[in-house]
Amino acid sequence: MVREVSASGRSVVVGVLRNRREAIVSACARHRVARLEVFGSALRDDFTSEESDVDLLVEFEPMQPYARVEAYFGLLDELRHLLNREVDLVMVGAIKNPYIARDIERTKQLFYAA
């Protein structure tokens, strides 16, 4: 679960995620998500509730490539609607820069696991 913090706008994201948890979990199940994790500014002091997007790392259950494309964009649309803000949805394995991948791996927080 995403940790709660009281300082800065990060608590806004935690609150929005918590308030929409049931709907987000339903969307994850519908789109065959294996894991959904939060990373980036939503977990740092530089998050601003007015401008920052929410960075999410997603791993889908095994499926055919075309089905994965549909699942990805379907989930992305639902998350943007549910969170009422921009969402950067990054698939596990898509980050090729080892420094960025290591930073995401080090800081990510689990939100959903099937």
Question: What do these predicted ranges mean?
Answer:
Residues 55-58:
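Short, aliphatic-rich beta-strand segments
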Residues 1-37, 43-50, 61-114:
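Catalytic core of pol beta-like nucleotidyltransferases
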